[in-house]
Design a protein with these regions (language model features):
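Hydrophobic, membrane-embedded alpha-helices of multi-pass small-molecule transporters
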Residues: 11-21, 169-176, 185-250, 288-294, ...
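Membrane helical hairpin/interfacial module
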Residues: 36-126, 131, 135
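Hydrophobic alpha-helical segments and their helix-loop junctions in multi-pass secondary transporters
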Residues: 93, 97, 160-186, 203-204, ...
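Membrane-interface loop-to-helix entry segments
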Residues: 141-170, 345-358, 370
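Loop-to-transmembrane helix boundary motifs in multi-pass membrane proteins
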Residues: 238, 242, 296, 310-339
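Extracellular/periplasmic helix-exit of transmembrane alpha-helices
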Residues: 241-270
Length: 370
């Protein structure tokens, strides 16, 4: 049974990491660190359980059953189809894909626009940016088996280096002053961190990514089913380790900056303050590049996953046509109506996450018994 070399395993692990690590993953840890203060360690343990361990277990569970269809289908074929369709639509074109464009626009473009921009001009700029963003993402997503070449070998290393630069800059710039935890964290930091990690909803994304990661593993020459499952599991473990490191580093940034920024609403404000304090005007460029890369990686990964799944579900419609449909739909939503879609979809996502957790452990237990 052929296996990947250590170098290629790292590439696949980087690729999976990049598909998980979007804007939300950048925002939650710094806010947790700032609010948890002296209780950051137990809070981070809670967050890592739901934001890293559960998604990694979901990847393993899906890999052991050779796909979500087989895993969910072991309960009932109708459940497999309905649940998978809902996951791909909600984590894909209805929510996450359009949000990658709108979030990266807010962080990579808006800070450089003058205050005199009218609402109409800003909307036009947003549409132009989103159109360009999705054209590039669609071109990259045309070849899902080559994601490893761009995301794994280029984009993720750049992203990790830039995050490391910010981390080192903050550690050098700010004294180690840890303030007391906010009232919401005192006495139950672990539980609060658990809920924070739950909000990333990466366990749902984990069900999506297995097929595309398997394609990239097969492109390296591993064709055996057991071999692909083994390498997918290793990729899940590798991506999980990377996520733990990055989450811990960005949470520590929040801890160090908490005494300076005061009360904040989200982690974006903390990161923006940190890079500006450390790097001045260049900090805007740095944080803009980081958010663009993170959002672009997730966008491409989700476009590939959703298009591949629906092509498998409805073979008469080609992968390319599904890709165009999801790209155009996501472009429209990113320009207008995203908040309304989020208001409708987020309650549904919160219902689906417990089902995903139960399905993950069901798959692990079922496979062990077999």
């Amino acid at each position: 049974m052929k296996s990947l070399s250590m170098r290629n395993r790292c590439v696949i692990g980087f690729t999976l990491f990049s598909m998980f690590f979007g804007a939300g993953n950048l925002i939650f840890p710094p806010l947790l660190g700032a609010e948890a203060g002296s209780s950051t360690i137990p809070a981070m343990v809670g967050m890592l359980l739901t934001a890293v361990v559960l998604p990694a277990l979901a990847v393993i569970s899906v890999a052991k059953h050779d796909g979500l269809k087989n895993l969910a289908g072991s309960i009932h074929p109708a459940f497999a189809t309905v649940y998978a369709v809902l996951i791909h639509l909600l984590i894909g074109p209805f929510v996450a894909i359009p949000r990658t464009a709108s979030t990266s626009f807010e962080m990579a473009v808006v800070p450089f626009l003058s205050d005199g921009f009218s609402a109409e001009s800003l909307l036009i700029m947003r549409c132009i940016y989103s159109f360009t963003f999705f054209v590039i993402a669609t071109i990259v997503a045309l070849k899902p088996t080559r994601l490893k070449d761009l995301l794994g070998k280029v984009m993720t290393p750049i992203l990790l280096i830039l995050i490391a630069v910010i981390f080192v800059g903050v550690v050098v710039k700010f004294p180690t002053v840890v303030r007391q935890a906010d009232a919401s964290y005192k006495g139950h930091a672990l539980q609060h961190g658990f809920v924070t990690g739950y909000q990333t909803m990466d366990i749902l994304a984990a069900f999506n990514f297995g097929a595309v990661i398997a394609m990239n593993i097969e492109a390296f020459g591993v064709k055996n089913r057991k071999g692909v499952a083994k390498e997918t599991i290793l990729a899940g473990i590798g991506a999980g380790i990377l996520l733990c490191i990055v989450y811990s580093a960005t949470a520590y940034i929040g801890v160090l900056c908490s005494s300076k920024v005061g009360n904040v609403e989200n982690g974006t404000q903390i990161l923006t303050y940190a890079v500006h304090a450390c790097f001045g005007i260049y900090g805007k460029v740095l944080i803009g590049i980081i958010f663009f890369i993170a959002c672009f990686n997730v966008c491409v990964g989700l476009l590939c996953c959703c298009s591949a799944y629906f092509h498998e579900l409805v073979p008469k419609i080609s992968y390319f046509k599904w890709l165009l449909v999801f790209s155009v739909f996501s472009f429209v939503i990113s320009c207008a109506g995203l908040n309304a879609i989020l208001n409708v979809s987020l309650p549904i996502l919160k219902v689906m996450c417990p089902i995903a957790i139960a399905l993950t452990f069901y798959g692990l237990v079922r496979h062990k018994r077999q």
